[in-house]
Design a protein with these regions (language model features):
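Short, hydrophobic secondary-structure boundary micro-motifs
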Residues: 28-29, 99-101, 110
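Helix-turn-helix
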Residues: 19-53
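Amphipathic alpha-helical packing segments from all-alpha helical-bundle domains
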Residues: 86, 105-129, 133-144
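Short, basic, alpha-helical segments at the C-terminal edge of helix-turn-helix-like DNA-binding modules
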Residues: 29-30, 58-70
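Basic, amphipathic alpha-helical hairpins
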Residues: 18-25, 68-74, 94-95, 124-127
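Residues in the recognition helix of alpha-helical DNA-binding motifs
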Residues: 15, 47, 57
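Hydrophobic alpha-helical connector segments
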Residues: 70-96
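Basic, helix-initiating cap at the start of DNA-binding domains
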Residues: 1-19, 23
């Protein structure tokens, strides 16, 4: 990727996180974000559709990062205590970013996104469990217990 594009993207992200740490998502304007990031509005729109797309992209990146750092995701069904600890450690590693991105109206999104990613991970490895209600309940319980 072109380094200029990556620097611009990082500038947008940094400005967004700074604004988001002080404001609700719904109160952040593209104009204010662009001023803080020192970019034109057209530059923002070249990267993201709107402020919600930016927020969703960052939220998804956090969830993917948490899931990628699980050392033994296959143990979710075999050793739920171990898996819960690993998941909790993933949350701790991203604690400040989670606190910013998933605050206010976005607070329920973290659990929903993690649950979807966790089920995708498990059902990708064990497709035979996709329709198993007990496994679905257990995965939800593990997540909400963490």
């Amino acid at each position: 990727m072109d380094i200029r594009i990556e620097k611009t993207r990082q500038s947008i992200i940094n400005a967004f996180i700074e604004l988001r740490s002080h404001k609700e998502l719904e109160r952040i304007t593209i104009k204010e974000l662009c001023e803080k990031a020192q970019i034109n509005k057209s530059t923002f729109y070249a990267h993201y559709q709107d402020i919600y797309h930016l927020s969703d992209t960052l939220e998804t990146e956090v969830v993917v990062s948490i899931m990628e750092n699980l050392t033994h995701p296959e143990r979710v069904l075999d050793d739920t205590a171990f898996f819960s600890r690993e998941l909790f450690m993933g949350f701790l590693a991203k604690d400040s970013l989670i606190g910013i991105l998933f605050s206010g109206s976005r607070s329920k999104c973290l659990v929903q996104k993690i649950e979807a990613a966790l089920k995708e991970l498990v059902f990708g490895a064990y497709p035979q469990y996709r329709d198993d209600k007990d496994i679905n309940i257990m995965l939800t319980y593990i997540l909400y217990g963490c």
